[in-house]
Curated annotation (Swiss-Prot):
Assembly information from the UniProt record: Homodimer.
Gene3D superfamilies reported in the protein's UniProt record: Anticodon-binding domain (3.40.50.800), Bira Bifunctional Protein, Domain 2 (3.30.930.10)
GO biological process, alphabetically ordered: histidyl-tRNA aminoacylation
Catalytic activity: tRNA(His) + L-histidine + ATP = L-histidyl-tRNA(His) + AMP + diphosphate + H(+)
Upper classification of the organism: Bacteria, Bacillati, Actinomycetota, Actinomycetes, Mycobacteriales
Main subcellular location of this protein, as a coarse class: cytoplasm
PROSITE patterns: AA_TRNA_LIGASE_II
Record-level GO cellular component terms: cytoplasm
UniProt source species: Rhodococcus opacus (strain B4)
Record keywords: Aminoacyl-tRNA synthetase, ATP-binding, Cytoplasm, Ligase, Nucleotide-binding, Protein biosynthesis
Subcellular location: Cytoplasm
NCBIfam families: hisS
A family per Pfam: HGTP_anticodon
E.C. code: 6.1.1.21
Protein's name according to its UniProt entry: Histidine--tRNA ligase
């Protein structure tokens, strides 16, 4: 009989298995906690949406829409797309459920997988994990600064240090049309290929975001948006920077920054980490004052960010750090016999009720095999129980780091374990 073939994860789609999955969860939860502390409520979004939502909201000239989306027809012949980013879906939900007609700003956070058909490379996956926030309904530079500070606090709370915040302004409706004309005039004088020229006609900022060396060299002297800001847009940007200074959030103004989505206006920012090489971005975002109206809602402003969980894990690794503990449990039970197993199963459940993570050696292993399993679990303590312990009414507690072992009465084992672990 031939052996059945096996399967692998799709190209560019990572698995997270223990112990690495523990770090992934710690990073995701750490970034989410920073948003929760700032009053952002959780929103759960569909994995797929109407394709038109992203075409209209993200921008048809972007690489995301033109090259990277997973789009297909469902059984009802409707065109749907696996979500490539979170903001458009959040705005759709806010409009659909009338959240924009309540207290403003609407502050929401989300976490989960997003999908882009990119060339797989280190930290750049086709299924990427993000934590994001959106603050909708108030055009206030102080809110811009708060959103940025939440992201900064999320990274620092995980112990990440070697990152920097780059920030710029993409202007407003007053100054962007004039700048667009000036930039197109510059670009059309260059020997651009047909595809790049087409992009310059639709959205010339996309050309400044081109990663090809020859295009970057040709556009090195392109006019900059920061030099063409209206008085209102400049005042807004200056106030954002003043708030960041007051909050103690360090930044670098990068006048050449262009984000990969078309909806950004005014404040735009990115967090980068040089330990990741060419793919240095670990998160970013900005203000999108026209997006809600573009999607059929009220003309309300908004600002948000998306932080890469996968890339933050890699950034921590580049600094020789990990987030959280990779241990599966804190206590590992080693039963020596069936009666001991029955008693340890009960003790384990009682410890779990106290919030202590506990696992057991199942499968009638010998002492040697059970202790090896205890060491591999990453637990701090092993509970050892044999016939003699049962007869004496005691349980052995072994410190797996030092090898020291003590015996305590069965009645005191819960309290003693809790005291040792500080639970």
């Amino acid at each position: 009989m031939s052996k059945a073939s096996t399967f692998s994860a799709p190209k560019g789609v990572p698995d997270y298995v223990p112990p690495q999955s523990s770090e992934f969860v710690a990073v995701r939860d750490g970034l989410t906690r920073a948003a929760r502390l700032a009053g952002y409520g959780h929103i759960e979004l569909p994995i797929f949406e109407d394709t038109g939502l992203f075409a209209r909201g993200v921008g048809e000239s972007t690489d995301v829409v033109s090259k990277e989306m997973y789009t297909f027809a469902d059984r009802g012949d409707r065109s749907v797309t696996l979500r490539p980013e979170g903001t458009a879906g959040v705005m759709r939900a806010v409009i659909e459920h009338g959240l924009d007609r309540g207290q403003l700003p609407v502050k929401l956070s989300y976490a989960g997988p997003f999908f882009r058909y990119e060339r797989p490379q280190a930290g750049r996956y086709r299924q990427l994990q993000q934590v994001g926030v959106e603050a909708i309904g108030v055009d206030d530079p102080a809110l811009d600064a708060e959103v940025i500070a939440v992201a900064d606090a999320g990274f620092r709370g995980l112990g990440l240090e070697g990152f920097r915040l780059e920030i710029t302004s993409l202007g407003d409706d007053t100054c962007r049309p004039q700048y667009r004309e000036r930039l197109q005039e510059f670009l059309f004088a260059l020997p651009l290929d047909e595809e790049t020229r087409r992009r310059a006609e639709i959205n010339p900022l996309r050309v400044l975001d081109d990663k090809r060396k020859e295009v970057r060299e040709m556009t090195a002297d392109a006019p900059l948006m920061l030099d063409h800001l209206s008085d209102t847009a400049k005042a807004h940007f200056d106030e954002v920077l003043a708030h960041l200074d007051a909050l103690g959030v360090p930044y670098v103004v990068n006048p050449r920054m262009v984000r990969g989505l078309d909806y950004y206006t005014k404040t735009t920012f990115e967090f980068v980490h040089d330990g990741l090489g060419a793919q240095s971005g670990i998160g970013g975002g900005g203000r999108y004052d026209g997006l809600m109206a573009q999607l059929g809602g009220q003309p309300l402003s908004g600002i948000g960010f998306g932080l890469g969980v996968d890339r933050t894990v890699l950034a921590l690794a580049a600094e020789g750090k990990t987030a959280g503990s990779t241990a599966r449990c804190e206590v590992f039970g080693v039963p020596l016999g069936e009666e001991a197993k029955a008693k340890l199963v009960v003790i384990a459940q009682q410890l779990r009720a106290q919030g202590i993570r506990v696992d057991l050696a199942y499968g009638n292993r010998g002492v040697k095999g059970a202790m090896k399993a205890a060491d591999r679990s990453g637990a701090a303590l092993a509970l050892v129980l044999g016939d003699r312990d049962i007869a004496e009414g005691t349980v052995g507690i072994k410190n797996l780091a030092t090898g020291d072992q003590e015996s305590v009465s069965s009645a005191d084992v819960l309290a003693r374990v809790g005291a040792i672990l500080g639970a």
